[in-house]
A protein has these predicted regions:
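Flavin (FAD/FMN) cofactor-binding and adjacent substrate-gating region
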Residues: 1-51, 56, 62-63
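A short alpha-helix-loop-beta-strand transition element characteristic
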Residues: 1-10, 97, 184, 242-249
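Short, solvent-exposed loop/turn elements at beta->coil junctions and helix N-caps
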Residues: 13, 60-61, 190-195
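C-terminal catalytic lobe of FAD-dependent flavoproteins
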Residues: 37, 170, 176-263
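Hydrophobic residues embedded in beta-strands of well-ordered beta-sheets
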Residues: 66-69, 146-147, 214-215
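Core beta-strand elements of the Rossmann-like FAD/NAD(P) dinucleotide-binding domain
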Residues: 71-79
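Glycine-rich, N-terminal phosphate-binding loop of Rossmann-like dinucleotide-binding domains
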Residues: 84-85, 218
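Active-site substrate-recognition segment that forms the wall
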Residues: 86-209
Length: 263
């Protein structure tokens, strides 16, 4: 499991003096860390290439009965893993995906203001809830001294990247209520992104129904990086037909086909 420590109010304010007054305590996860997704992905690609893996840069057009066809005209044969996030239905229309839009703000450099990634205990309710829109306090100090401020969630199947000022204001006011010093900081950039969310809130991990050579890993909402290692272990065990460390059934893409038939 993951080690966590309950802390009282005295310890909480020793850890993060800039927090708003009045909190009764919190929870410290000493080994918590922040990973920058693109850098991790590039590291893994380079590591695979150093071991003989060949990297092709192309666009996948469609799955074939024994591989995948690329836009450049090449057809690759063998097992295929589809991990394309919100774009999953382009290759696998039987597995619907919803886009859950989020806003982020990055500030100028303010080293020392915040020492830990800090979030409200109710963050999980926002992340895993089914509300059309929600906000939660989630702030990260970056190695550069900048502060990354989140988080917001709203379903946006049109995938409009435009910043919503009402949602941004709502998210920031939530953050200010936990960390008042944020109100006086200069923001450098505001942007949006989209979290791929399955229709039942559980990711698709496993073999694609009706396709022996195709596998899928998608729909993790905002926990793709956090659960990446567990997802990889589960997929490898399934591919090699080994016993899995956890029950894979709740994540089996076939559950969606079964639900459709039952309906």
């Amino acid at each position: 499991g993951i080690h966590a420590e309950a802390v009282d109010d005295t310890a909480l304010y020793q850890l993060e003096p800039a927090l708003a007054p009045g909190f009764a305590g919190g929870m410290l996860v000493p080994r918590d860390a922040v990973a920058y997704g693109p850098a991790v992905a590039m590291h893994l690609v380079e590591r695979a290439q150093s071991r003989g893996t060949r990297l092709l840069r192309d666009r996948a057009l469609r799955l074939t009965r024994d591989g995948i066809e690329l836009q450049g005209g090449q057809t690759l044969r063998g097992s295929v893993l589809v991990a394309t996030g919100c774009a999953l239905p382009e290759l696998l229309p039987a597995l619907p995906m919803r886009a859950r839009k989020g806003h982020l703000v990055i500030t100028q450099r303010y080293p020392g203001l915040l020492r830990h990634q800090t979030l409200e205990l109710g963050y999980a309710d926002s992340a895993h809830g089914s509300d059309d829109s929600s906000v939660a306090f989630n702030v990260q100090p970056r190695p550069t001294g900048q502060i990354l401020i989140g988080s917001s969630r709203e379903f946006d199947d049109a995938m409009d990247p435009a910043v919503s000022m009402p949602m941004l204001r709502r998210m920031l006011e939530r953050s200010f209520s936990y960390l008042p010093a944020l109100r006086g900081l200069d923001a450098l950039r505001v942007w949006t992104g989209f979290r791929p969310t399955s229709i039942d809130g559980r990711p698709y991990i496993g073999r694609v129904p009706g396709m022996d050579h195709a596998w899928v890993a998608a729909g993790h909402e905002g926990l793709g990086i956090t659960t990446a290692l567990g997802t990889a272990h589960l997929l490898v065990d399934l591919l090699l037909e080994r016993p899995t460390a956890i029950d894979a059934a709740p994540f089996d893409p076939a559950r969606l086909a079964a639900a459709t038939v039952a309906a």
